[in-house]
């Protein structure tokens, strides 16, 4: 990986310009173990993953204007392109794959903010986004001898919001967003959808030394037209949100928090209209979320300058949940609705910093999640849908977590990170043949920053997946084993 900060220059007292870019290339030909059966005594062989090359390029530039403490402007331009091979699932005696995927994306966005007075603040933004994707499978057994699909999408977006501070501890805001999305492709009888979206939100917030309350209502209006076939239809939805945070002890940063949120999610164009993926019969996803939690933070002493912990329990009721299943490769998934899902879980996080010496700092953090996500669509065991009643939904582990440890010194920085995921199922039916083992990943890195002439330079070396295990996040798609990555960052 090579990353370079090309420019960050203050033009005058009001304007600053910046630009940076990144390029990455990898053949991705990593070894893995192919199992000839599910039993431990079955044969295995060492193979090499093929058609896994990746090349990416990213560039962006920004212009920042600070006219005063109460007036700012931002402009950003972005470009990204990539090409990658799409390896097939690891099946016996057939690892041939020549499928390729090319992506391009560019956008320009701007933001303006003006504080007219202590009471009134105005903010607006605009964005134009263009994306292109080309998918090629040269081995398709059809009259053309291949599948070659190209998709083009554009978005035009405008938003405006106003904030009114009625009192020092009471404020209200009104915001509205409008967007037009279009999609086209090189396919016969393609839908050519156009989506008109209008979202308006009214929100209020009250806060004092011991209590914070926020509430909002979001009105969503969606109109969608197509030139061919069926569309996702038109939708009208009003979704509320309310949250509260209570601080019972004046001298301690201990808080009790709660929120309720109603969520409405419309399927994306990719979900609906991609030939290999899309399902125009997808229904919008609706969810009701309830959350209650505790947070605590403290500066204990000079040796322990920072300590924090959070724990949250949540309950979600989701109807028409949009889920995806992988098929022949990681770019082609099958989309469908799952009638009703009940989710219960606990999230816990913790972090602390130790300062044993003035210029040496140790940072530790971690998080843990327990999540029960059950299909409760149909309780009749005599039906096909009833076979998965109260089963964990596919690719959703009950337990997962991660952790980080780092040491900062004036000479070199060292860090260690890990993540783990418990057992999952590749289908909604929780039976032995659908089970996937859990996995863990451990990585370490060292880095150093220094100045050379007028540049700020940093160098880092990472050893990824130090246990060298080809674990699978998606069944039959093994991840790379141990690898080393070096990064050079030069900032002018």
Q: What is each of the regions a protein language model found here?
A:
Residues 83, 223-228, 232-238, 246-291, ...:
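Surface-exposed extracellular loop regions of Gram-negative outer-membrane beta-barrel proteins
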Residues 3-42, 60-64, 311:
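Predominantly transmembrane beta-strands of Gram-negative outer membrane beta-barrel pores used
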Residues 26-30, 37-39, 46-56, 64-122, ...:
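Flexible loop and strand-edge segments within Gram-negative outer membrane beta-barrel domains
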Residues 13-14, 69-72, 115-121, 165-171, ...:
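Short loop/turn motifs that connect adjacent beta-strands in outer-membrane beta-barrel proteins
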Residues 23-27, 79-83, 128-132, 178-184, ...:
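Transmembrane beta-strands of outer-membrane beta-barrel pores
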Residues 20-22, 26, 119-137, 249, ...:
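Membrane-embedded beta-barrel scaffold of Gram-negative outer-membrane proteins
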Residues 26-32, 314, 319-320, 362, ...:
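C-terminal beta-signal and adjacent terminal beta-strands/loops
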Residues 168, 210, 308-317, 334-428, ...:
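Gram-negative outer-membrane beta-barrel transporters
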């Amino acid at each position: 990986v090579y990353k370079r900060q090309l420019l960050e220059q203050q033009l005058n007292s009001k304007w600053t310009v910046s630009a940076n870019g990144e390029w990455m290339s990898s053949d991705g030909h990593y070894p893995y173990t192919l199992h000839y059966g599910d039993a431990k005594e079955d044969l295995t062989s060492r193979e090499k993953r093929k058609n896994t090359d990746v090349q990416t390029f990213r560039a962006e530039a920004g212009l920042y204007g600070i006219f005063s403490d109460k007036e700012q402007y931002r402009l950003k331009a972005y470009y990204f392109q990539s090409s990658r091979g799409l390896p097939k699932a690891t099946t016996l005696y057939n690892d041939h794959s020549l499928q390729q995927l090319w992506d391009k994306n560019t956008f320009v966005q701007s933001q303006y903010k003006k504080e007219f007075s202590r009471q009134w603040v105005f903010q607006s933004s605009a964005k134009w986004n263009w994306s292109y994707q080309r998918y090629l499978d040269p081995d398709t057994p059809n009259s053309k001898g291949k599948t070659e699909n190209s998709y083009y999408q554009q978005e035009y977006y405008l938003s405006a919001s106003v904030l009114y501070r009625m009192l020092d501890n009471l404020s209200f805001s009104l915001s509205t967003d409008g967007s037009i999305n279009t999609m086209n492709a090189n396919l016969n009888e393609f839908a050519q959808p156009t989506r008109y979206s209008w979202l308006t939100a009214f929100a209020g917030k009250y806060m004092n030394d011991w209590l914070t309350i926020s509430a909002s209502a979001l009105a969503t209006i969606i109109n969608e037209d197509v030139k061919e076939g069926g569309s996702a239809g038109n939708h009208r939805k009003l979704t509320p949100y309310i949250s509260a945070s209570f601080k019972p002890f004046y001298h301690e940063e201990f808080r009790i928090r709660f929120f309720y949120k109603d969520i409405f999610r419309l399927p994306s164009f990719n979900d609906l209209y991609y030939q290999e993926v899309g399902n125009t019969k997808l229904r919008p996803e609706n969810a009701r979320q309830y959350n209650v939690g505790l947070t605590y933070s403290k500066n204990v002493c000079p040796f322990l300058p920072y300590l924090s912990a959070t724990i949250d329990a949540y309950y979600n009721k989701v109807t028409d949940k949009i889920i995806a299943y992988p098929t022949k490769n990681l770019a082609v998934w099958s989309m469908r609705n799952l009638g009703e899902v009940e989710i219960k879980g606990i999230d816990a996080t913790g972090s602390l910093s130790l300062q044993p010496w003035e210029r040496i700092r140790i940072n530790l953090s971690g998080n843990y999640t327990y999540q029960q996500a059950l299909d409760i669509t149909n309780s009749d065991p005599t039906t096909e849908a009833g076979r998965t009643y109260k089963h964990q939904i596919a690719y959703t582990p009950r337990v997962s977590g991660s952790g980080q440890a780092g040491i900062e010194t004036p000479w070199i920085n060292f860090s260690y990170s890990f993540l783990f995921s418990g057992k999952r199922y590749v289908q909604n039916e929780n039976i032995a043949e659908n089970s996937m083992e859990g996995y863990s990943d451990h990585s370490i890195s060292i880095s150093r920053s220094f100045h050379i002439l007028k540049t700020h330079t940093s160098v880092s070396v990472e050893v990824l997946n130090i246990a060298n295990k080809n674990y699978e996040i998606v069944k039959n798609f093994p991840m790379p084993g141990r690898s080393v990555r070096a990064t050079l960052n030069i900032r002018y």
